[in-house]
């Protein structure tokens, strides 16, 4: 490890790292790697087969394992077979069904056709509470996000449940 004059640490750690506090994280979610039935780009809702492979959701209210993430700051479970990171906590960029302008911060969403999130009505929330994927937290106006300049590509921010 090397520390610069401004206190920045750089380097690689082999073994255990312990810190009392950490600040300044620039990524938004915690992800779990899963095996995939097909290549799925970030931003899509996925369901899983009985053997645990994920695939894009195909219908509204389909049980959803998560949203494929390219904004995670921490991930677990990557192996030679598990290459698809699913957001399990925090915020993730997701593609939405229909007109993006119809979505607003605070809207509840579920999985939908083509792996896109769908806005839920109050009645649907009462009928299908187990199908809630998350809550819209922001409709970005910017084209890239973060230090790696992740393409937003028309996606919206979802706080995953």
Residue ranges and their predicted role:
Residues 2-161:
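Extracellular receptor-binding modules and their adjoining Ser/Thr/Gly/Asp/Asn-rich linkers
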């Amino acid at each position: 490890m090397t520390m610069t004059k401004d206190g920045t640490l750089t380097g690689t750690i082999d073994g255990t790292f312990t810190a009392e506090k950490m600040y300044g994280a620039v990524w938004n979610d915690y992800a779990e790697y899963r095996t995939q039935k097909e290549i799925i780009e970030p931003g899509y809702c996925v369901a899983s087969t009985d053997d645990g492979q994920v695939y894009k959701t195909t219908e509204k209210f389909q049980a959803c394992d998560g949203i494929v993430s390219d904004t995670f700051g921490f991930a677990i479970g990557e192996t030679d077979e598990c290459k698809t990171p699913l957001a399990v906590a925090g915020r993730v960029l997701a593609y939405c069904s229909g007109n993006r302008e119809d979505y607003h911060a605070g809207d509840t969403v579920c999985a939908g056709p083509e792996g896109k999130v769908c806005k839920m009505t109050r009645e649907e929330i009462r009928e299908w509470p187990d199908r809630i994927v998350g809550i819209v937290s922001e409709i970005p106006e910017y084209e890239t996000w973060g230090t790696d300049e992740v393409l937003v590509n028309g996606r919206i921010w979802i706080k995953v449940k």
